[in-house]
Amino acid sequence: KDGYLVGNDGCKYSCLTRPGHYCASECSRVKGKDGYCYAWMACYCYSMPDWVKTWSRSTNRCGRGK
């Protein structure tokens, strides 16, 4: 599946201050095919396994505590 990587806090992986290869590395770490820093804000990955958590507007819990 494709989507934004999500951390344990429910927030998208930020890439604003990261090196250019950061997102591609993080995506491959979770068995994704490739990834990039979308609009310099968050990591977007391609072809990840279904078990990888991705961000969704309907299940967004970033900034809402646990």
From Swiss-Prot:
InterPro entries: LCN-type_CS_alpha_beta_dom, Scorpion_toxin-like, Scorpion_toxin-like_sf, Scorpion_toxinL, Scorpion_toxinL/defensin. Its main location: secreted. GO terms for cellular component: extracellular region. One of its GO terms (molecular function) is sodium channel inhibitor activity. Residues 1-63 form the LCN-type CS-alpha/beta domain. Has the structural arrangement of an alpha-helix connected to antiparallel beta-sheets by disulfide bonds (CS-alpha/beta). Beta toxins bind voltage-independently at site-4 of sodium channels (Nav) and shift the voltage of activation toward more negative potentials thereby affecting sodium channel activation and promoting spontaneous and repetitive firing. This is Toxin Tppa1.
